Amino acid sequence: MLSFELSDEQKEIRDWVHDFAEREIRPVAHQYDESEEFPWDVVKKAAKVGLYSVDFIQQTYADETGLLPALVAEELTWGCAGIALAITGTQLPVAAIFGQGTPEQIATWIPACYGTADNPVLGAFAVTEANAGSDVSSMKTRAVKKNGDWHLSGQKVFITNGGIADVHVVVAAVDPELGTRGQASFVIGKGTKGLTQGKKEKKMGIRASHTAEIILDDVVVPSDQLLGGEEKLEAKLARARSGEHGRSSVALKTFETTRPVVGAQALGIARAAFEFARDYAKERIAFGKPIIENQAIAFKLADMATEIEAARMLVWRALWMGRHGGEFKMAEGSMAKLKCGEVAVKVTEDAIQILGG
């Protein structure tokens, strides 16, 4: 059964990440949000201290409760959502490689996503297309086998680290008639001919994170860079063609496991807004007393804190289930992400109202 008391190790790591966010992220958050430049300096500092590394990711996801990834994500995003995503964005392709790859692919490509402490690099996970966002079955990017290699052509949009990553994990349709069950994931290394960056997006938020199109123009991918290998893919396609019931697409499987952590990112945003509004309310004097002593303000802050705590429990429950029960029974990961996103919107809106008081 899940204990609500964090271990000493979990607390130590959480506090270490919080200190990094307070010391290295918050002071430059405004600068990178204004410039919309990728925060390489912060990523390099994270790599130097071991926060952006294969070893830390292994330690984080080896946590027996499953909670540590959320603790880390919440603290980083408390510092700045955009810079946090610059540091954590590589986890999505890593999750795909770890979940789908062979032992050899895992050993080769996960370290390649991070680089070294002296020379950190990035990974990207490319699924979304102009007409295939939530509707992954409408994906137009194709992978065709020719002379032993795979040839990929198509265009992806809204890709975190797209075009600047050293490793891109790209999902493409191998057999379009099978919908999501006819898709596969491919690892594409830096410098591969035919993969280029398209338009970089200008965003209303998380602007320190690089978001761009990637264009695949007959990109040749060796067969050993098909995640899971040829035999596994052929077996999956055969089951689908025979009408055998199967699970969702490779892309959706990856998203399913990472949704609670995205929820934790929203919690970091909400918590930062709540703390800022609470501290302001203690200092702002109106009618001879701090506005936090006004019941309307106090009630609003109490509701904000309650919503944050309740949403965190959904995240923790989903992560515990993922660690101990395998698959979610009732879309618990999506529930956690949904609730946390709604809480982030509500809390930040209420914080703005308090700052106007």
What label would you give each PLM region?
Residues 218-249:
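Long, acidic (Asp/Glu-rich), low-complexity accessory segments flanking structured domains
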Residues 1-79, 83, 100-104, 116, ...:
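Alpha-helical interface subdomain recognition
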